[in-house]
Design a protein with these regions (language model features):
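Residue-level signal for inorganic ion chemistry
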Residues: 70-72, 118, 172
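Acidic, divalent-metal-coordinating active-site segment for phosphoryl/phosphodiester hydrolysis
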Residues: 148-160
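PRPP-dependent phosphoribosyltransferase catalytic core
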Residues: 158-180
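Mobile, glycine- and charge-enriched loop segments
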Residues: 134-147, 151
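Residues at the starts of beta-strands that form the adenosine-phosphate
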Residues: 97-98, 143, 170-173
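Active-site-facing substrate-recognition patch
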Residues: 1-68, 80, 84, 88, ...
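Short helix-loop-beta junction
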Residues: 88-97
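Short glycine-rich phosphate-binding loop at a beta-alpha junction
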Residues: 63-76, 145
Length: 180
């Protein structure tokens, strides 16, 4: 969280308007620590939403392990360099396949609006239109690490995850640097 202690100050500086740089050295170890915790969660899930699926039996754990792990980025209008750096680092660290970037069309949406308005803006702006047939095929049945720089309302992550699930991803796990 950007309003907390610890790395919050460094995160606030990194997310400031106009800043687009790679993750600074001071944040790299904490980012990888969070990535490790996320990896443990990814290994413990099957991607199903029901209560029974959250408890993976010994018989089904091998099925989960066989699912490919992919990294998908959400295009950033303000910090494309930062998001790509995070995505490459996570893919490398977690041995995930870099799969693609969810495109963003239209003008940037406002964050100071009601939830329904924000959802409508986000839903109309995210797209998989630029994805190749090969990338779409590799998405089917995959576990996905969804990478973005920060989140506020959560709608971008929710809509992007929904798009990926509808396109065939078995599970989607969000990863963001900061939460406002």
């Amino acid at each position: 969280r950007m309003d907390g202690l610890g790395v919050a100050g460094a995160l606030r500086e990194l997310i400031e308007p106009g800043t687009d740089a790679e993750v600074p050295n001071a944040l790299r170890a904490p980012v990888l620590q969070v990535a490790e915790r996320l990896a443990a969660l990814v290994e413990d899930t099957t991607g199903e939403n029901d209560e029974d699926a959250r408890t993976v039996s010994a018989d089904s754990s091998s099925q989960t392990d066989d699912l490919p792990l992919c990294a998908v980025l959400i295009e950033s209008r303000r910090r494309p360099r930062l998001v790509r750096h995070i995505g490459r680092a996570l893919a490398h660290h977690l041995a995930a396949i870099p799969l693609g970037i969810i495109g963003v069309r239209g003008e940037p949406g406002r964050h100071d609006v009601g939830s329904a308005y924000r959802l409508a803006e986000v839903a109309s702006s995210l797209t998989l239109d630029e994805w190749s047939d090969d990338a779409r095929a590799r998405l089917r049945g995959a576990r996905v690490i969804l990478v973005d720089d920060w989140t506020d309302s959560g709608w971008t992550l929710t809509v992007a995850a929904s798009m990926l699930r509808r396109a065939g991803a078995a599970a989607v796990h969000p990863f963001v640097l900061a939460q406002r």
